[in-house]
Swiss-Prot record:
Natural source organism: Shewanella baltica (strain OS223)
One of the record's GO cellular component terms: cytosol
Record gene name: fmt
Protein name: Methionyl-tRNA formyltransferase
Top-level taxon: Bacteria
Function: Attaches a formyl group to the free amino group of methionyl-tRNA(fMet). The formyl group appears to play a dual role in the initiator identity of N-formylmethionyl-tRNA by promoting its recognition by IF2 and preventing the misappropriation of this tRNA by the elongation apparatus.
Amino acid sequence: MKPLNIIFAGTPDFAARHLQALLNSHHNVIGVYTQPDRPAGRGKKLTASPVKELAVANNIPVYQPGSLRKEPAQQELAALNADIMVVVAYGLILPKVVLDTPRLGCINVHGSILPRWRGAAPIQRALWAGDKETGVTVMQMDVGLDTGDMLLKTYLPIEDSDTSASLYEKLAEQGPVALLQALEGLANGTLAAEKQDEALANYAEKLSKEEARLDWNKSAKQLWQEVRAFNPWPVSYFEHQGNTIKVWQTQVSETTSTAAPGTIISASKKGIEVATADGVLTLLSMQLPGKKPLNVADILNARGEWFSPNTRLANEAQ
């Protein structure tokens, strides 16, 4: 297969993994687009994205326009004369004139099995909803949000132990493999594009800190899904004793209870059992303010008096 001249557009670590795969391939990455440097850390020092750092280390020209809607930026991109543009978690909207510029158009690697979970947080929403599988879709981009024709899909079962952090890692390995397969198929003309079924489409909204508050009036199963979805960010939490307590790991208990939602049923080194609207949730790993995440045995050693049976934990709906 003849090497393709590729423009790569992406910003976070997930995107950098895909750029590395392209750099390891026989294709030519002729330019990299990434978001402008942003203030980060306590000192708010301007910091380059992981994609920019990788591109600079490999002596690839880097472009960081604040927008691709203006003609000078569009002309600069067109002058690269790329065969194709690969977009992974870039964060800027590509207008139609940009989508139409490369000979083979623009393709995107998306962390879900489209058309399910279009949008910003597909990995997290799959866990949040209790999906049994997720995966990666490589699609031909159009002007819509993740609405383009699908070129290739890979599938990944979601395990009970998975969190957003672990799924992110698995998909960051699966995505680059799918990307290289899709590029080969496009170059050879062997890929058949498949339209998305709009009836099956839904939207993966961004997560918010407020959404991560545990509402004991939900079911134990839903809360268990949320804790996994919101790990590593924004991390599920509840208010108790005037403190915000983060919850990193839970499981659905086989215990049954008629106690009011938010009531502690039992507290031992095996876990703190809390009644919900449907079932009992066992808290296994938590984080007290200013401390590291700890297993429940250590939490009880430090603050056992906070978690006595029959204590009621704060609840949004109280």
